[in-house]
């Protein structure tokens, strides 16, 4: 295939998929060359759209509309839009340090242009139409607080962030797609990982009252603005909280050694729900379990009549490598294992999960806010990953769980849409991606084969442990923590000037052309994934 043919291919693929889903309207839309200036934020009492979307509420273990009809929330998450992540967008390190490096290298004005264009192209009306035509009923939008509030000006809210969110809310309203607002990156960081825009490996939200005050106040502001917007299905008030490892990930406080601080998380969740209810009595509020949405059994019983709960349900066969059903070989920092997985084991995994048990015991809805499979491992194993995902969704459906996949769009890892490898953006960052892969900076991608740098890091972790001489420290967990600290956080941030330098000296027109690679019509659909999701999304509630 010639380069010209490769560049035309994503549009052809997009239009083929549009025809498959009935989305012929997609063919006529293009992203603007220059974004319109943001308009004023709509008032909280803005009228509903012509779609007559209805407020949703909790009724026992179900979610229903105003007439009491059952509603099933099925959809995805546009991670990488208003909360960037390294493996989704292609950059190294955390978003806020990347923005600082881009401003340093490109200058503040050109860096601002870069990020605004990325936001313009990454998720817009074309994407909303695409999702509706696949059958999605909801989109969970991950948000970084920095779009709405600056650390230098706490409690002063930025209309630019609300205006951008409002624009997408209007698109969703016009096309009948419900929205769940997800605070993915909170003030002071609710966990110690990169996906909360954290470059420090510490978490301050749980111990610093000023961060808690700002977090609660921001949610009150969201609720004040959107109290009368039926397009919003609810508020996911905190993504993947981790209430009790504020010093960072260490072998003694992760995985089976993690112990939630139930007093902290129960207190903060009660406070934020109370503050929201002062201005918004109608929207569902979703609470995620502690320890990255996995632990629930220390939660208070539901204390509001419109609460639902959210777990995350990533499973080994969705990542591989290996066959499904059959033997899967999950990788760790110190080697690979072997596990047998099939439908029955996936079902046991789901039914044994604390989120499943808690919601059953308390007669409240369960929403699996994140789960997914990956497609950048061995290409011949992609059918195995799809079979695992298909079985997983079938289990959710049989048990009445609502669900949203992770992730909607990315650079070729797990998205419904992926950037074309021949696109201007992917060609420009190709060498950097190879360096990232060699250095193991994307901590998420643990399923890929180890590189010499990863092996050397594991050896270093072993040498550290040998000198420390504490036999109680698990070698695998130690290697995992050393790798994350050294490669994801330190090395990822170290590489950010290299990423910024790739865009130095470009005109705004050139930059716009490169970033248009993120537009829906230039992306390549993952047809296998879309077909699996559409099969379930199109089903009645």
Region spans (language model):
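C-terminal segment of N-terminal export signals and the immediately downstream linker at the start
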Residues: 28-53
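An active-site-proximal structural segment forming one wall of the substrate-binding cleft
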Residues: 117-137, 156-185, 197-234
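The substrate-binding groove and active-site-proximal loops of carbohydrate-active enzymes
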Residues: 112-118, 151-162, 201-212, 256-263, ...
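Active-site region of glycoside hydrolase catalytic domains
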Residues: 58, 189-335, 354-374, 398-404
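N-terminal secretory signal peptides
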Residues: 1-10, 17, 21-24, 34-37
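Aromatic-rich peripheral "rim/lid" segments of glycoside hydrolase catalytic domains that contact
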Residues: 378-541
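N-terminal carbohydrate-binding accessory modules
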Residues: 44-136
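Aromatic- and acidic-residue-enriched carbohydrate-binding clefts of CAZyme catalytic domains
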Residues: 92-114, 154-159, 191-209, 252
């Amino acid at each position: 295939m010639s380069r010209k043919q490769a560049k035309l291919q994503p549009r052809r693929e997009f239009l083929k998929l549009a025809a498959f889903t009935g989305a012929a309207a997609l063919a006529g839309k293009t992203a603007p060359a220059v974004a319109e200036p943001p308009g004023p934020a709509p008032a909280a009492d803005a009228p509903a759209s012509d779609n007559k979307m209805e407020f949703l509420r909790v009724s026992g273990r179900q979610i229903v509309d105003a007439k009491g009809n059952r509603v099933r929330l099925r959809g995805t998450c546009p991670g990488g839009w208003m909360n960037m992540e390294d493996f989704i967008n292609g950059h190294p390190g955390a978003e806020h340090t990347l923005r600082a490096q881009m401003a340093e290298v490109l200058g503040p004005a050109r860096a601002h242009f870069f990020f605004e264009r990325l936001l313009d192209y990454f998720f817009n009306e074309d994407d909303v139409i695409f999702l509706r035509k696949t059958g999605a009923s909801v989109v969970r939008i991950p948000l970084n607080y920095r779009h709405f509030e600056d650390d230098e000006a706490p409690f002063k809210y930025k209309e630019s962030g609300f205006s951008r969110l409002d624009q997408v809310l209007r698109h969703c309203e016009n096309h009948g797609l419900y929205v769940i607002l997800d605070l993915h990156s909170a003030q002071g960081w609710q966990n110690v990982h990169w996906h909360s825009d954290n470059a420090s490996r510490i978490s301050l939200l749980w111990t610093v009252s000023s961060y808690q005050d700002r977090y609660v106040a921001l949610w009150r502001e969201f609720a004040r603005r959107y109290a009368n917007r039926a397009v919003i299905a609810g508020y996911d008030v905190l993504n993947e909280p981790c209430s009790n490892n504020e010093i960072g990930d260490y072998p003694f406080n992760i995985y089976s050694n993690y112990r939630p601080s139930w007093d902290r998380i129960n207190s903060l969740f009660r406070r934020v729900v109370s503050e929201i209810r002062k201005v918004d009595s109608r929207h569902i509020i979703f609470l995620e379990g502690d320890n990255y949405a996995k632990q629930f059994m220390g939660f208070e019983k539901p204390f509001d009549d419109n609460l639902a709960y959210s777990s995350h349900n990533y499973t080994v066969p969705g990542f591989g490598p290996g066959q499904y059903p059959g033997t899967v070989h999950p990788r760790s920092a110190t080697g690979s294992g072997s596990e047998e997985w099939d439908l029955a084991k996936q079902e046991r995994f789901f039914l044994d999960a604390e989120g499943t048990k808690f919601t059953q015991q308390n007669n409240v809805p369960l929403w699996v806010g994140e789960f997914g499979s990956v497609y950048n491992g061995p290409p011949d194993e992609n059918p195995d990953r799809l079979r695992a995902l298909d079985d997983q969704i079938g289990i959710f459906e049989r048990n009445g769980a609502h669900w949203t996949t992770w992730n909607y769009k990315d650079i070729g890892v797990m998205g419904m849409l992926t950037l074309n490898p021949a696109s201007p953006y992917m060609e420009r960052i190709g060498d950097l991606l190879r360096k990232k892969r060699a250095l193991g900076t994307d901590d998420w991608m643990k399923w890929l084969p180890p590189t010499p740098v990863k092996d050397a890091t594991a050896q270093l972790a072993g040498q550290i442990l040998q000198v420390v001489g504490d036999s109680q420290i698990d070698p695998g967990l130690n290697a995992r923590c050393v790798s994350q600290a050294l490669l994801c956080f330190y090395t990822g941030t170290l590489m950010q000037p290299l990423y910024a330098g790739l865009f130095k000296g470009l005109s705004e027109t050139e930059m716009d052309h490169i970033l248009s690679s993120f537009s829906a019509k230039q992306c390549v659909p993952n047809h296998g994934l879309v077909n699996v999701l559409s099969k379930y999304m199109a089903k009645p509630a």
